Amino acid sequence: MAGVKLAVCAGGLEDPRKAVDDLAAEGVEAIEANADFFLTNSAGMVTETARILHDGGITIRSVHAPFGNQHSLSAPDEDVRAQAVETHAQLLRQCAYAGVSVIIAHPGTSEAPDRVAEMLDWCQQSLEELAPIAEQTQVRIGLENMLPNHPGTTGEELLRILDAVDSPALGVCFDTGHAHCNGDMRGVFEVVKDRIITFHLADNDGVGDLHFQPPYGTVNWIDFVSVFRTMELEYRDFMTVETPPWPGGGYRQLIGQVSAL
């Protein structure tokens, strides 16, 4: 994967100058942040924090939206789902102040595995509300392929939602760890590859979503790189390593090892 730009997951935005010092020392150029900072601070604070990071050579490239039953875009409970939509809408607006390119959203949780078909419909309805906001703010939504027993496990399920909503602000966040747990990483990739707008690179044992740093699990990275190269439009943006560094190492080592795959 030589030549691919890598982002890392990092926090510490409450003290942006320290974050810049720490990240720059490790050779980090871009990060994925979690949503809490954006949802609990003012637009002015978000703007100023992003400016400090940008001046220090660090881009907040993506933000992971809240997830879990209480934040599910496909929650069976209509009130919970409405609140989840509002939270995602607020996040889109806040991320726009920081120049964030994409938020990562889960289609849903495993709270009702016997109702996945209905949950896909509810997720579609939620995204129909969010897509105009994403278009207006110019912050895209990357819908993540999920673990077994979740809506969005297969590539076909993701495309069903994206095709129905039909917005240029929506795409796929391809998660290698989730696809590996489903037993067919290449198959999922082949289905969604023309709709991928961002990546989560992670490794595991093929059973649990362990978030090991690549390549310390059982993902076939040679196979992944091979299928990655079949994308019709060459992917030139950052790919996020959604794991901590392997114990004993730092971000510089993580970036070096993943780049060498």
Tell me what each language-model feature is.
Residues 32, 62, 104, 142, ...:
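Conserved beta-strand positions in the central sheet of alpha/beta enzyme cores
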Residues 14-18, 55, 74-171:
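Active-site acidic/histidine proton-transfer and metal-coordination neighborhood
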Residues 43-46, 73-75, 115-118, 154-156, ...:
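Short secondary-structure transition/capping segments
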Residues 20-26, 41-63, 90-99, 128-136, ...:
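Acidic (Asp/Glu)-rich catalytic clusters
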Residues 69-75, 109-116, 181-182, 207-212:
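A short acidic, helix-capping loop that chelates divalent metal ions and anchors anionic groups
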Residues 1-97, 258-260:
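N-terminal pre-domain/capping segments
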Residues 9-13, 34-38, 65-68, 108-110, ...:
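Active-site beta-loop-alpha junctions enriched in small/polar residues
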Residues 1-5, 13-27, 152-261:
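Histidine-acidic metal/acid-base catalytic patches
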